[in-house]
Curated annotation (Swiss-Prot):
Catalytic activity: tRNA(Val) + L-valine + ATP = L-valyl-tRNA(Val) + AMP + diphosphate
EC number: 6.1.1.9
One Pfam family of this chain: Val_tRNA-synt_C
Domain notes: ValRS has two distinct active sites: one for aminoacylation and one for editing. The misactivated threonine is translocated from the active site to the editing site. The C-terminal coiled-coil domain is crucial for aminoacylation activity.
Biological process per Gene Ontology, one example term: valyl-tRNA aminoacylation
Protein name (record): Valine--tRNA ligase
Gene: valS
Motif ('HIGH' region): 44-54
Amino acid sequence: MELAKSFDPKDIENHWYSVWETAGYFSPAKREEVNAYCIMLPPPNVTGTLHMGHAFQHTLMDALIRYHRMLGDNTLWQPGTDHAGIATQIVVERQLDQEGKDRRQMGREAFLERVWQWKEESGSTITRQMRRMGTSCDWSRERFTMDEVLSRAVTEVFVRLYREGLIYRGKRLVNWDPVLQTAVSDLEVVSVEEQGSLWHILYPFEHRAENGEKGLIVATTRPETMLGDVAVAVHPEDVRYRHLIGHHVRLPLSERTIPIIADSYVDPAFGTGCVKITPAHDFNDYQVGLRHKLIPLSIFTLDGKINDNAPVEFQGLDRFDARKKVITDLQAQELLVETRPHKLMIPRGDRTNTVIEPMLTDQWYLAMEGLAKQGLAAVESGQVRFVPENWAHVYNQWLENIQDWCISRQLWWGHRIPAWYDEDGNVIVAYDLEEARKLSGKENLHQDEDVLDTWFSSALWPFSTLGWPEQTPELKTFLPGSVLVTGFDIIFFWVARMVMMSLHFTGEVPFREVYITGLIRDAEGQKMSKSKGNVLDPLDLIDGVALTELIRKRTTGLMNPKQAESIEKATRKQFPQGIPAFGADALRFTFASLASHGRDIKFDLQRCEGYRNFCNKLWNATRFVLMNCEGKDTGLDEGLPLNFSPADKWIIGRLQQAEQSVIQAFNEYRFDLAAREMYEFIWDEYCDWYVELAKVQLNSEDEARQRATRRTLVRVLETVLRQAHPIIPFITEELWQAVAPLAGKTGASIMCQPYPQPDQLRIDEQAAADIQLLKEVVNACRTLRGEMKLSPADRIPLLIEGDRARLINFFPHLQALARLSEVDILPGGLPDTDAPVAVVGDFRLMLKIEIDVKAERERLNKEILRVEAEISKARVKLDNPDFIQRAPEKVVQQEKGRLVTFSTTLKKLDEQLRKLD
């Protein structure tokens, strides 16, 4: 098989993905006798497109799945998408808006038909993009959170929880989006620091002045909400106000009086130490209100206007217009004492950017206390393990302080709550209308208008996708799953809820391990966001993108169009030529190399370029092997003699060590260490050293030596292709198809081959020592050549002082790799000349050439300083009692050996310097 001269990923990627999917390689093996390995894909929003966070996590999941597939496990990577209630409804409403239509005019049924139509037309965008990354999910099992099977599971769970007394309806404070007019979760609220004001307002005493004071001065950042105040609170130990507790003040701009109460929630040092209490529109105030049995007074309509509970002159005003009027009226009545600039965190909806309003509304809730105890026990007992383990603390902290979950949303798109009402307002929770009529004995029922929080159906994902509530073979085989790969930002919203729901309904944990990844940031450590203009599209890194198109993508759809100019300027500076095509393998290798256990991951485009070069290196090495081995004897006939050289034995031994390191890294979720080991072995050991040594051996007149060299070349290469396949699947498949026959391997795909396992018996310590010496001598020669500024074309004789037997067999390799005309070991030692001398252990090396004495003296002094520094480092360690006591004995002995070696080297360098003098 002839490979193209250069690596072009595009054709390879398109070809092989189609082959894999068509052949059914992504599906489970369906063999009960083998170990099951299952990963549930965190379902991306059906509205979404692939972003860097997806691409990063999908790469890691795919690497794990491919690795375990090659280990022979019965693997399932369950894909699917989330209906994403709010996000999807917004997308479709915006389309309708462009057509001059409104969903309320259309009606619920027609609107939902339109959403389903959009989902069928556009909902598969992200899964097509996932295929471009090489993700080997079992697409035949793809699920959608609102498909028939999953919807049935959602209804089953809701009805059971209600009948167990865990779901109830109640009026509580929620995050309310006045634009969407729905409750939203904390995850959909983004708190942004903004410049605001702190208004100091006089609340006059009810009857008379106290100690000459007219009233209490209250500090607030939201003067409009004072229309809903029901108390003023002070700290019970605050001596300034303790005597006023139990008295009343008049609420400015209103006819009401409100009490002065004592509560330790108040910070005496903030503002004036007096806090207005508005339980209907502040989460902290709501808790204060509960403690003091205050009746909340809601003053906002659901669209953020002032309602009829406020004085008539404010009714109907938008909340921000009401703020202006409140301030103006307070000034007119001389009740506004002071206004100060004040920075504060403003909660905004992540979809609408509107200020989120705490709002008292009727909602459905799930009682969490009992479920949380199960969730905590699962981690404490080790049934679920977090990697890194510190994230278990975050999980536990949330469950230990959990509140009941508001599970209803005021949307049309989503799982409609299976609750019906009769004409008297009685609620009937049932599986369907027919059962509701049966239970109520009434025909005229209407269903609850609300839908469930998207996270409710997502919490059932690990078992609903396997066919629950039916007891399917898949449920029996793949629950618990093996690992969940996700981000730390949804430990509360998703991970914990999956654990609780799975335990409650199946008695099993949803997964045994949770691998928490870091957050992908830009090269400067900034979070990638549209507003910052630093977002990268993974497909642009795979296919490349022109500068004009990159600017268009970054400046379209900005919430603040004024940012477009600065974003364009920054983009032109960073990517003057656009972004070149790196291919999926280079991007995947970049992600793997960055996947440490840190919280933040800086994505540097230069890494992509470096790993594209790595792919080229692997490609070119394979071309060399094919050119020298195809059509020739590669040692397949075991009856023919094989004469393995120390170089062959060394690379085979190094391969065993690399295999051990990579397996350990995969098992510990250290993708960065796996990638580094692969990179260093392939580039440094195999390509830069072994291939160069093999070139010499292929010119040997010993046929058994040539045969052994060709066998080693192809078998080591075939093995590293299998080893690297989970991370770089496309190039390894293409190259394996060409190399495998030469290594005696058969099979339709590298995906179906066994993963390389180390054999410690194949490590030859003597060969390793011999090649290490050879490498050091070659490097010393190259250093001498560089310092003497010799042209690569100049072939110079090398003179050596030392043990002839240790190097005699490597003269041809030395000549080739160090570009020498000849090599000679002098029994009487090196000549007493001004020529520079390099020291390698017990060997002294000299290139036979006239030298610049001054330059050589500088070189020796520089080398002496370096060696003295190494001696100092070694002595510091060996003089440290903690190091001697705590370090492994092997490490201590290594350090002692280093000290002896460097001391010997220093002595020889001093001798050389004296000779120059």
